[in-house]
Amino acid sequence: VSAALTVQWASLTHSGSRKARNDDSFIAFASSPKGAETLPAHGSRSLENDDLVFAVSDGMGGGNAGDLASSLLLTRMAEIIPETFKTAAAGFFPDRLEYLRKAIQSVHEQINQAANNDETRGMSATLALTWFTPENLYLANVGDSRIYLSRAGKLSQLSVDHTAAWSSWKRGAIGEIEYRNHPRRSALYEVIGGGHAQVCPHFAAVPFVPGDSLLICSDGLIDGLWERHIADAMASGRPVWEIVEILAKRAIDNSGIDDTTLIVVRVA
């Protein structure tokens, strides 16, 4: 049996210049039969005994509703994901993507139920979640928080932005400049909460190899960065905390209006 791989990570969140409150939330936790263990802002951990989960959520809504939606979403995911170990111990091995689908739908309904007064009405959140197991990386996303993979110097977006403008860009109907200036670039047709009965996340299962790096981020980071900037920083081979600082500084210097949150993860 080959030695278990180690995951290194670093994270950062920065409040945008537009408002006092940061509506972004992020979480890093180790998932095991004992439950979820919250991880520090940066560190490294073996996949031998734990699954590792990293997620970013951008909350939307008036007052403190956005902050509430994003933090409620991630808190619940940290409660639900470790339950897979209990079902496995009982002899049932859940399909992790199906499990994630049910978990996200359940939190979607919970956020809708919590949006029952003037303060919280219409509150919603995006999600970009990566779940590392010893065999595979499972990911889920809703909205326009993103997950990128950098492998052998090549950057690919694993998540899907749930906007019509992004779809037009990806199928080549418009270029990156037109996309970035599109008036409806942030008009999301999928969110968690927001009053709709169902949510339809994007899911994927991706094998990972040593040397892979992942970026999980809110749209605030993307506002100030071209894709080539992300590709260059992710392929630089620098320590993960340094990549986080380089990307965040560049994004905030170039834009900085929206909240900016990112996690960089490297498999070693």
Show which residues each predicted segment covers.
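PP2C/PPM-type serine/threonine phosphatase catalytic domain
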Residues: 1-268
